[in-house]
């Protein structure tokens, strides 16, 4: 895991100092070393910050070249099946200078297979290869979007980096907040790629590659699409076959992600996902499992620390526990936002992951396995709920207009809240509107000339056209994989872990598992309306039924409970601060006062207040440059 950056100039010569500023703004992503390469004509420069995970030798440093120096690569991530690919390349006559660097495997793969080599890679990655013979730069992002990559063009230059802050370290890049992105953030807690929170700063979409030539022409292509698999369901598979194949792929995915030359562990919540990963770690002979769980220093029915302890005894591993309180959380916000400020921390679990990874670092670990992606693979409980809602919304849309009006008149508030997610002939999943609805935004935003954030969801849902009773859920999964995961869930893993120089690996987002699961029918994945039916069936071989079939709340439920019923004074004070408060450039201050008032009436507006608070912290950092 590392930080990468680069510049191509189409006119003036480049200096090393330009790249060093970008590279070293991301020192947290790679504290173990740094490298730089500049072309003979001074028109191309690449930089790298290294976090040493595989092949700790100096020979594995980056930027790395091929044998004749015609190719240069900078790479962030891991290719977990690099050993198999290396064997194939060696049989084809390739000679390697490193002992076991996956970076060198990428560059030789490009030599052998060109752009199609990416189809062989099983892992998480964002890399850039400069091909001196063809005078082009090739940038690739992994299929699911686990690793980020950003780019911009300015003053006859093309710049890219692992983080937006690296781009802004170049004084030529103007920082201007994108107000449409603020509107989208308020609804979906993120911004759909290729947009970011800033004008003219772009994020390469997951499963995409881009080619930039020495004239400045840019070509972006999609090399992988989850919709291909969602639109091609397997209808003739049995339950036994589905369970057996899922178990086989998960076991292999975990096994591959145990390859490391540095200590590794796992974040453990006691839920199905992290428990299953831990069980397979044990199965693959990791006997000294270092697992970390977290608890809150508040009295709550949502605490699952006792459950986590029982599971650790049944599987057989030592559980490291960390308890945090309100002050820890407040301090974590300040520490995190001083390191990472590309996006607002709209999901408070971002801060939780920062605190967890900080403790992971204290334990001497460099790599952790995490359970993200298990919900999408297994079938999350709310999928059942939104599938039911889909039926009701479709029924509502089919009614004559006078009946629709009658329903609105009977209970206008509830009707608007629920039925507002039927847009013309299209019904969207309201579960993807985690924040403010369009109607709510119209009341709080000072300007209302933004495109509806619902259109983002609607467009993605319309990509799925397969027939059958699973249609709506397949549409929902397309949104999950193309928006919620790469733009919200995975950044809340990558950013806070990398802020502590920790590499997070995501076994449930192994693309082979994602592809297979996406094609499975939901009557098997969620048989008898049991969420994660297949995963629980597999896990039943490792833990007792009373622990397996309990109601799961997860790390985040305690945090939601914490926000809804306490809303710390520091959140209130910052939002209501009238002195140079940048949020008032966009949000009506009276609406914030109203939310505060409603929250005091026990109406649970804590999460929405957090969204506004995180936006305020983001604007505090950036608005000075507008």
PLM regions: where:
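Short acidic/histidine-rich active-site segments
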Residues: 365-381
């Amino acid at each position: 895991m590392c930080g990468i950056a680069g510049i191509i100039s189409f006119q003036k010569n480049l200096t090393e100092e330009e790249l060093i500023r970008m590279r070293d703004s991301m020192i947290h992503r790679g504290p173990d070393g740094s490298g730089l390469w500049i072309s003979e004509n001074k028109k191309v420069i690449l930089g790298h910050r290294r976090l040493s995970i595989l092949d700790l030798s100096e020979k594995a440093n980056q930027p790395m070249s091929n044998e004749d120096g015609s190719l240069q690569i900078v790479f962030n991530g891991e290719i977990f099946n690099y050993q198999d690919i290396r064997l194939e390349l060696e049989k084809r006559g390739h000679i390697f200078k490193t002992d076991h660097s996956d970076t060198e495997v990428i560059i030789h793969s490009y030599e052998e297979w060109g752009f199609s080599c990416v189809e062989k890679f099983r892992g998480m990655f964002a890399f850039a290869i400069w091909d001196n013979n063809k005078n082009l730069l090739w940038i690739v992002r992994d299929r699911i979007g686990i690793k980020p990559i950003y780019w911009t063009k300015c003053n006859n230059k093309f710049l890219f980096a692992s983080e937006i802050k690296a781009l802004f370290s170049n004084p030529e890049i103007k920082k201007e907040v994108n107000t449409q992105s603020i509107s989208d953030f308020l609804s979906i807690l993120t911004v759909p790629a290729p947009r970011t929170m800033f004008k003219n700063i772009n994020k390469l979409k997951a499963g995409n590659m881009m080619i930039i030539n020495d004239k400045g022409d840019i070509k972006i292509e999609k090399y992988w699409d989850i919709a291909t698999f969602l639109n091609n369901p397997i209808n003739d598979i049995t339950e036994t076959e589905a369970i057996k194949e899922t178990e086989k792929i998960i076991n292999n995915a975990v096994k591959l992600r145990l390859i490391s030359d540095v200590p590794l562990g796992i974040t453990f919540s006691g839920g199905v996902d992290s428990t299953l990963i831990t069980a397979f770690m044990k199965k693959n002979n990791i006997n000294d499992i270092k697992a970390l769980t977290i608890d809150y220093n508040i009295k709550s029915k949502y605490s699952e620390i006792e459950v986590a302890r029982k599971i650790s005894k049944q599987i057989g591993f030592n559980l490291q526990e960390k308890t945090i309180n309100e002050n820890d959380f407040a301090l974590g916000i300040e520490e995190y936002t001083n390191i990472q400020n590309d996006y607002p921390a709209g999901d408070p679990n971002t801060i939780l992951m920062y605190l967890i990874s900080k403790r992971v670092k204290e334990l001497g670990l460099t790599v952790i396995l995490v359970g993200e992606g298990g919900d999408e693979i297994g079938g999350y409980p709310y999928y059942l709920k939104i599938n039911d809602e889909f039926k009701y919304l479709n029924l509502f849309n089919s009614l004559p207009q006078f009946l629709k009006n009658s329903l609105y008149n009977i209970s206008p508030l509830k009707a608007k809240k629920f039925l507002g997610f039927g847009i013309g002939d299209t019904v969207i999943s309201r579960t993807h509107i985690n924040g403010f609805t369009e109607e709510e935004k119209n009341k709080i935003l000072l300007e209302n000339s933004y495109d509806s954030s619902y259109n983002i969801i609607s467009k993605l849902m319309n990509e799925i056209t397969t027939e059958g009773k699973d249609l709506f859920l397949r549409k929902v999964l397309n949104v999950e994989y193309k928006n919620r995961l790469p733009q919200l869930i995975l950044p809340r893993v990558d950013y806070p872990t990398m802020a502590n120089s920790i590499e997070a690996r995501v076994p449930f987002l192994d693309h082979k598992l994602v592809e297979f699961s996406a094609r499975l029918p939901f009557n098997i994945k969620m048989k008898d309306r049991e969420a994660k039916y297949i995963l629980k069936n597999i896990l039943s071989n490792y833990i007792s039924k009373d622990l397996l079939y309990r109601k799961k709340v997860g790390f985040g439920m305690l945090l939601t409970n914490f926000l809804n019923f306490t809303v710390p004074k520091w959140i209130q004070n910052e939002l209501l601060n009238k002195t140079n408060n940048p949020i008032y450039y966009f949000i009506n201050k009276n609406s914030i006062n109203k939310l505060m008032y409603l929250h005091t009436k026990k109406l649970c507006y804590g999460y929405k207040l957090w969204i506004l608070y995180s936006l305020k912290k983001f604007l505090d950092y950036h608005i000075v440059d507008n």
